Amino acid sequence: MQQTKKLTHSDITIAVMSGPFLQRGEPALVSKWYRTKMALACGVDLVVELPYAFSTQKAETFANGAISILNALHVSEICFGSEDGQIENFYNTISVQKNEEETFNRLVKQFMNAGNSYAKATSEAFLHILSSEKNIDMSQPNNILGFQYIKAILMQNSSMQAQTIKRFASHYHDETFNDQHIASATSIRKQLFSENSSFTEIEPFIPKATASLLASYKQNYGTLHNWEQYFSFFKYKLMTMSPEDLRHIYEIEEGLEHRILSKIQTSSSFHSFMEALKTKRYTWTRLQRACTHILTNTTKEEIHCANIEQHAPYIRLLGMSQKGQTYLSKNKKKIELPILTHTKTFDHPTLHIDRKANSVYFSIMQEPLRAQLLKQDATHHPIRYDETTAKFL
């Protein structure tokens, strides 16, 4: 956050945040309201939600939704972390892909026909057409997402400028702490769910406010969220589905339904199920997203109605500092998308999916807590934060 503010000289900062389920196809560690508090306490001025229909998607769709929201809020610059760290290289890579589009598409098809996943095929195609040091490594996950952010800016004819910060020490998929001060989200999550885990081990790697709020969530609700807690629900759902039922679920295609129904029979945990399910063609993340859609019963028809090829249909405001509130007041007449401060009276196909996802997310809670949290999610007004006193209002 400090590096972003230093690099962009921003007046205010806006974060677009996933809701209950994340882009890599897993439940968020804590609710979006607690994560909003974390963001505000760390210096963000406005926190808005990226709808489920965009947030649990491949990088291209995820980026398109996020950029459309930022564009609607009249953001002048975005900043993202990347393995490359040189923004010029992203623009060079986009230019090469555009100029070599026919060759690129042919290579992607060729590598997919050889049994590779789309992500792997795309990475291999880039390796073949990108030879200059001025291009980015498209096998790296944060480079891929940054590439899609900039493509979305260009596709939406936005005047937004992009900046990037190089990731140091820890890599996206690292499962262990390799540095004294920097750790990947993957390694932090693994530590939190390890035997005899405590928050002490992760405290050097996260802000104090984040550590405090994580501990508070676990104390108040008795749990942090991961896939294993949902596995019994997930397995039960699959045991009651036919291949035809499963084919209606978003991202279930090319016979994947038969493999899923076969592997679930002998799986005793989500991790063992994923180990049995993954192949060269289907990456772990791609499969986790498909499993998330099964868990939330998100169908192809629902995603079609959400019209994800277009821009996000609304802005769900989750939290704001005093500076953020002032910014919204000054610019609200220019913002063309509806800004939702709660969702109890608004209706849209995209919001219908969000409501289902929230319901599933809280399903692991005991009653009456589950019902209370679900009701609060619809009626919850944006969290307000006084940055001068560092207190929530």
Curated annotation (Swiss-Prot):
It is found in: Cytoplasm. SUPFAM superfamilies: Nucleotidylyl transferase. Keywords: ATP-binding, Cytoplasm, Ligase, Nucleotide-binding, RNA-binding, tRNA processing, tRNA-binding. Its EC number is 6.3.4.-. GO terms for cellular component: cytoplasm. Pfam families: HIGH_NTase1 (PF05636). Gene3D superfamilies: HUPs. It catalyses: cytidine(34) in elongator tRNA(Met) + acetate + ATP = N(4)-acetylcytidine(34) in elongator tRNA(Met) + AMP + diphosphate. It is an enzyme of class 6 (ligase). InterPro entries: Rossmann-like_a/b/a_fold, tRNA(Met)_cyd_acetate_ligase. GO terms for biological process: tRNA modification. Its main location: cytoplasm. GO terms for molecular function: ATP binding; ligase activity, forming carbon-nitrogen bonds; tRNA binding. ATP binds at G81, N142, R167. HAMAP family: TmcAL. Catalyzes the formation of N(4)-acetylcytidine (ac(4)C) at the wobble position of elongator tRNA(Met), using acetate and ATP as substrates. First activates an acetate ion to form acetyladenylate (Ac-AMP) and then transfers the acetyl group to tRNA to form ac(4)C34. Belongs to the TmcAL family. This is tRNA(Met) cytidine acetate ligase.
